[in-house]
């Protein structure tokens, strides 16, 4: 009989989808196991016959499914306003590029967000965060990018820090100052990039407000040369990087980000084979964002078969934002990734667990159920992981465990 230490907590009579690639079964499934949690981490996974049947800190889950906590590795959670009117314009024939050129798009949200009080932004973002938590999300990336000036970018990152301080969910904050050219720099995008590189990145990094730097390399964002200035600045300071690339056209953004060993290249609908090879060589995760693909009614699919062939890890995220993916649901993103992009349900699960963890640089601690990893997991009223992907309108979450505590 396995001896437990005071303070140990056990979840027994469970079916574990460990998402551990070292296990041979699909989803890393193992039956009739018990999960021992100690000091917020998984201490061990053992056959349940090695443990007492009952006790003060022993939870009998009656055969329920347990998975790692979900990870949403790409969101724009902190913003004010909405862009419903733009959506109607697009449905009446206007393109995303045309709307952006007329001062809409990202800059419309920038105006609303700059004018919004920090406490109001916090309350709006907190409600969105808790919606994701209710689906089993335990680690969440939050980008800035709706300030496009030092003061408001800092305000957005402070909101992310305040959300993290609640200890309800892990937050990975990302500086996305190179999201768009603000109206006041419309005729001088290079000047804005200078502001980002010489002021925003170093000052906000010194304050410890973000974990990584992101950028938007696209015809409606920044060109390759401007994007590289951002990457060079970040890497000179030792900051991990990532990029929104190849969403609407092929500019070579994936190759650029991979050359700087980027954590991830996101969107990637127009990614070509050279870009896929560069991602493999750079250790860069491909992040699929099917919500934006759906909402913009795009037709160019990301090259899933090429990503498989080159063994590039593929993550899936909600891309929750007011303009192009107003879907605060990782379950829906998983379903869309399967239906629209052809992922298997197991690939979708890997995309919101171990590969999403890698996209945030957390692969050594998050995204799998194995000894030494964080005790962030979800108990589901389900028999198979596919059920969560198959029916996104139904949430079979039974229990969410964060840092070893039922939350």
From Swiss-Prot:
GO CC terms, sorted: cytoplasm
The UniProt annotation places 4-imidazolone-5-propanoate binding at: 83, 146, 179, 247, 324
Lipid metabolism keyword on record:
no
Residues binding N-formimidoyl-L-glutamate: 146, 321, 323
> Which InterPro entries does the record match to this protein?
Amidohydro-rel, HutI, Metal-dep_hydrolase_composite, Metal_Hydrolase
Q: Identify which cofactors the protein needs according to its UniProt entry.
A: Zn(2+); Fe(3+)
Its signal peptide is none
Q: Where in the cell is the protein located?
A: Cytoplasm
Return one GO MF term.
zinc ion binding
Read off the CDD domains from this record.
Answer: Imidazolone-5PH
The record lists Zn(2+) as bound by 74, 76, 244, 319
Q: Which residues bind Fe(3+)?
A: 74, 76, 244, 319
Question: What family is this?
Answer: Belongs to the metallo-dependent hydrolases superfamily. HutI family.
What does the record give as the function of this protein?
A: Catalyzes the hydrolytic cleavage of the carbon-nitrogen bond in imidazolone-5-propanoate to yield N-formimidoyl-L-glutamate. It is the third step in the universal histidine degradation pathway.
- Protein name, as recorded: Imidazolonepropionase
Q: What is the lineage of its organism?
A: Bacteria, Pseudomonadati, Pseudomonadota, Gammaproteobacteria, Enterobacterales
């Amino acid at each position: 009989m396995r001896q437990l230490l005071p303070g140990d907590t056990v979840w027994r009579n469970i079916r574990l989808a460990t998402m551990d690639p070292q296990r041979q079964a699909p989803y890393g499934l193992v039956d009739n196991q018990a999960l021992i949690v100690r000091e917020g981490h998984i201490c061990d996974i053992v056959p349940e016959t090695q443990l007492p049947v009952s006790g003060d800190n022993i939870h009998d889950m009656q055969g329920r499914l347990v998975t790692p906590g979900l990870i949403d590795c790409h969101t724009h959670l902190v913003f004010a306003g909405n862009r419903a009117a733009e959506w109607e314009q697009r449905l009446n024939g206007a393109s995303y590029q045309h709307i952006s050129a007329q001062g809409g798009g990202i800059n419309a949200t920038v105006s609303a967000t700059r004018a919004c009080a920090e406490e109001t932004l916090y309350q709006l973002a907190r409600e969105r965060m808790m919606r994701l938590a209710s689906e089993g999300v335990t680690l969440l990336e939050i980008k800035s990018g709706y300030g496009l000036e030092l003061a408001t970018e800092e305000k957005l990152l402070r909101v992310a820090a305040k959300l993290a301080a609640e200890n309800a969910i892990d937050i990975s904050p990302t500086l996305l100052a190179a999201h768009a050219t603000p109206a006041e720099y419309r005729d001088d995008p290079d000047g804005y990039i200078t502001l980002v590189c010489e002021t925003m990145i170093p000052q906000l990094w010194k304050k410890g407000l973000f974990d990584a730097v992101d950028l938007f390399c696209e015809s409606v964002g920044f060109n390759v040369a401007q994007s590289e200035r951002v990457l060079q600045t970040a890497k000179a300071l030792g900051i991990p990087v990532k990029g929104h690339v190849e969403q609407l056209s092929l500019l070579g953004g994936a190759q650029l980000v991979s050359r700087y060993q980027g954590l991830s290249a996101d969107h990637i609908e127009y990614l070509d084979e050279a870009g896929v090879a560069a991602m493999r060589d750079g250790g860069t995760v491909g992040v699929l964002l099917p919500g934006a693909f759906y909402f913009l009614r795009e037709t160019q699919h990301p090259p899933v078969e090429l990503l498989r062939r080159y063994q590039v890890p593929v993550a899936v995220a909600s891309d929750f934002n007011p303009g192009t993916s107003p879907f605060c649901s990782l379950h829906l993103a998983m379903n869309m990734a399967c239906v629209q992009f052809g992922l298997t349900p197991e690939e979708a699960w890997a995309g919101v667990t171990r590969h999403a963890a890698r996209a945030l640089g957390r692969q050594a601690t998050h995204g799998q159920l194995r000894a030494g990893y964080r005790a962030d997991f979800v108990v589901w009223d389900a028999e198979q992981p596919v059920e969560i992907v198959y029916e996104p309108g139904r949430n079979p979450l039974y229990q969410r465990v964060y840092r070893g505590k039922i939350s």
